[in-house]
């Protein structure tokens, strides 16, 4: 019997558009001989709809105007337990932070990807650092900035950052993905502007020393015995891998495998699996590293529990390089969700 799978897309995060593109790719490549699919779109204002129209309209955003194929029963499909598993192809806020995972847990429906705790910790860049510091994982030096403290003690915070980190630094909203709200500061003026911008997206901001490093990504797949694909490398078109470089600028390059020695490739794979286990991840995650160009020291950058599934995304590309077809990968992560729920 075919399993019934709800594919959730859209949502209220700043990554709404990226989610639609990822979901379109999943819907076009899922094995329909194994699964009956229920596409459920969530608008930016939080309304849920089952959408049975053209997949291309999901990617473009036109699905919201396609009233004939848009049914206001999206929530009921989950609440009435009409599906066997949920695949939240939703990046960022509410999709990747433990919120939808908690809803599925309450409804006793298997959910693709890590669970509530793991998703919440991995989504929050600051808490990821706090947790992994206790495991001795090497990370870039940082300062955490709170919106309330910044408002009342701006110059003290600026001085702390300058004294501890110097320049250059990266400024990142703690709970944001796809490089939304991230900037690089080379001086005080850019630091202040970057903090103001990042605080528009989150009340908590991470400021990190900017390493002269290469960006290495590792796809991890599995539950109790996860495995890692051969690492890939991002060569950004811009100064760093910002939103434009990820989704708009064709000059960014994805190298598979990463241009590292065989020994270093293996070390990065092993470290990715260790971090996956440390954070109690499950199903899938993409673990991103920075490798210092001079010393070749490996630093954790971040973990993505719902990695991009667009046609140019690194996660599926890394597994395709291992011989795992896109549709096969989708099937495997769905089955991993069911497997974990049955234990």
Swiss-Prot record:
Positions annotated to bind ATP: 162-217
GO molecular function: ATP binding; D-alanine-D-alanine ligase activity; metal ion binding
Residue ranges constituting the ATP-grasp domain according to the UniProt record: 129-335
Binding annotation for Mg(2+) 1: 288, 302
Domain of life: Bacteria
Cofactor section: Mg(2+); Mn(2+)
EC number assigned by the record: 6.3.2.4
Note accompanying the cofactor annotation: Binds 2 magnesium or manganese ions per subunit.
Disulphide connectivity of cysteines: none
Protein name, entry field: D-alanine--D-alanine ligase
Organism: Clostridium novyi (strain NT)
Gene name linked to the record: ddl
């Amino acid at each position: 019997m075919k399993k019934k799978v709800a594919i959730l897309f859209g949502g209220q995060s700043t990554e709404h558009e990226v989610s639609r593109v990822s979901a379109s790719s999943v819907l076009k490549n899922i094995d329909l001989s194994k699964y009956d699919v229920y596409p459920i779109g969530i608008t930016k204002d939080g309304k849920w709809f089952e959408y049975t129209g053209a997949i291309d309209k999901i990617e473009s955003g036109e699905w919201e105007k396609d009233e004939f194929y848009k049914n206001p029963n999206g929530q009921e499909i989950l609440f009435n337990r009409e599906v066997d598993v949920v695949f939240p192809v939703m990046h960022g806020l509410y999709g990747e932070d433990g919120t939808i995972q908690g809803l599925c847990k309450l409804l006793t429906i298997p959910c693709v990807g890590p669970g509530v705790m793991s998703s919440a910790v991995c989504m929050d860049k600051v808490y990821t650092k706090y947790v992994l510091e206790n495991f001795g994982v090497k990370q870039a030096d940082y300062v955490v900035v709170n919106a309330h403290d910044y408002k009342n003690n701006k110059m003290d915070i600026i001085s702390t950052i300058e004294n501890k980190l110097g320049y250059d630094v990266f400024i990142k909203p703690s709970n944001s993905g796809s490089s939304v709200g991230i900037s690089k500061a080379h001086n005080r003026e850019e630091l202040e502007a970057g903090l103001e911008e990042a605080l528009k997206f989150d009340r908590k901001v991470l400021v990190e020393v900017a390493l002269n490093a290469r960006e290495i990504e590792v796809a991890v797949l599995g539950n109790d015995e996860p495995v890692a694909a051969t690492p890939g490398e991002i060569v950004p078109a811009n100064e760093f891998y910002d939103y434009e470089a990820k989704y708009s600028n064709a000059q960014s390059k994805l190298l598979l495998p990463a241009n590292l020695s065989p020994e270093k490739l293996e070390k990065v794979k092993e470290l990715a699996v260790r971090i996956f286990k440390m954070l109690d991840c499950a199903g899938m995650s993409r673990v991103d590293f920075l490798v210092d160009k001079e010393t070749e020291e490996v630093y954790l950058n971040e973990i993505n529990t719902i990695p991009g599934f667009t046609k140019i995304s690194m996660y599926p590309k890394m597994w395709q390089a291992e011989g795992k077809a896109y549709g096969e990968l989708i099937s495997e992560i769905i089955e991993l969700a069911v497997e974990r729920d049955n234990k």
